[in-house]
A protein has these predicted regions:
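Intrinsically disordered, low-complexity, positively biased terminal segments
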Residues: 1-85, 92
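Hydrophobic pocket-lining residues that define ligand/cofactor binding sites across diverse proteins
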Residues: 207
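Conserved acetyl-CoA-binding loop-helix of GNAT-fold acetyltransferases
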Residues: 192-204
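Residue-level preference for non-acidic, small/hydrophobic
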Residues: 112, 200-203, 230
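Active-site/acyl-donor-binding loops of N-acyltransferases
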Residues: 60-61, 70-77, 213-254
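A conserved beta-strand-loop-helix scaffold within acyl/acetyltransferase catalytic domains
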Residues: 52-65, 72-192, 232
């Protein structure tokens, strides 16, 4: 690879395929490969200006005639949980978060498979093997970490934390100006615990503690029920044509 290719990466466009979020539409992605010889500041720039990471690929929607996918990030220093979010935090008070290196385990994979089979059995990740899961966790050229959420058993005085039941896992990247939530999953049997919301709340608090101003939540699509939850976390910024634009939390948040 030449020095010019390191500074100016090559981009590619995927073939059109059905959009998983908007019925009757086709999606394409613009993507580039992330490698160790690319400048860290270049990779960080991509991931803080609308690109998302999947293993060692950085991609952004590149759909003809459609700009529905909007990057969103929470302004963590100004964020205040609404009443519903406070109840969710209280409901999960027995969960303990542990930040660890991006090292997959068979226990994580079992939980991942349970989650996928229950919630996304017809999605693009339905056929992921244990090797695929390992690659999703390990393949990264930036500062990536896992957060495991384990439930402390009643009276577990001498039981090590890694023996507590695993309830949820989040895969995240640490960027120069925030944390990017790459993927998360949880025990579908705990549907009433709202673990997806709880993990976002926990990472907002974590970003604030370590002095990072943003939590990146990926793409939000107006009118998509799958994406509607992201509008509840605010104030947030949404990436426009040229800059990030401030948006207050949705009025239905409480």
């Amino acid at each position: 690879m030449t020095e010019q290719q390191k500074k100016f990466p090559e981009f590619y466009v995927t073939a059109p395929q059905p959009c998983p979020y908007l019925a009757g539409r086709l999606e394409r992605k613009l993507f580039t490969h992330l490698t160790n010889d690319k400048p860290p500041e270049l990779i960080d720039r991509l991931l803080t200006t609308g690109f998302r990471r999947s293993q060692n690929i950085a991609y952004v929607p590149y759909c003809e005639g459609c700009q529905a996918c909007v990057s969103v990030r929470v302004l963590v220093d100004e964020f205040e949980p609404n009443r519903s979010m406070s109840r969710i935090t209280a409901r999960n008070r027995r969960l303990v978060a542990r930040r660890i290196a991006p090292e997959p385990s068979s226990e994580q994979y079992r939980l991942f498979r349970t989650y996928i089979d229950a919630r996304h059995s017809d999605g693009g990740m339905a056929d992921m093997s244990v090797l695929d899961y390992r690659m999703m966790i390990e393949d990264s050229v930036i500062d990536t970490f896992l957060t495991e959420y384990r439930e402390k058993p009643e009276g577990a005085v001498d039981l090590a934390i890694d023996q507590w039941p695993l309830k949820a896992v989040a895969l995240c990247d640490r960027l120069t100006d925030g944390i990017s939530m790459v993927y998360s999953f949880y025990d579908p049997a705990e549907a009433n615990a709202s673990l997806g919301t709880f993990m976002i709340l926990d990472h907002i608090a974590f970003a604030r503690r370590i002095g990072l101003p943003h939590l990146y939540l990926g793409y939000w699509i107006e009118g998509s029920r799958k994406m509607a939850y992201k509008a509840k976390f605010g104030p947030q910024e949404r990436l426009g044509t040229d800059t990030w634009e401030r948006v207050e939390p949705s009025s239905s948040s409480d």
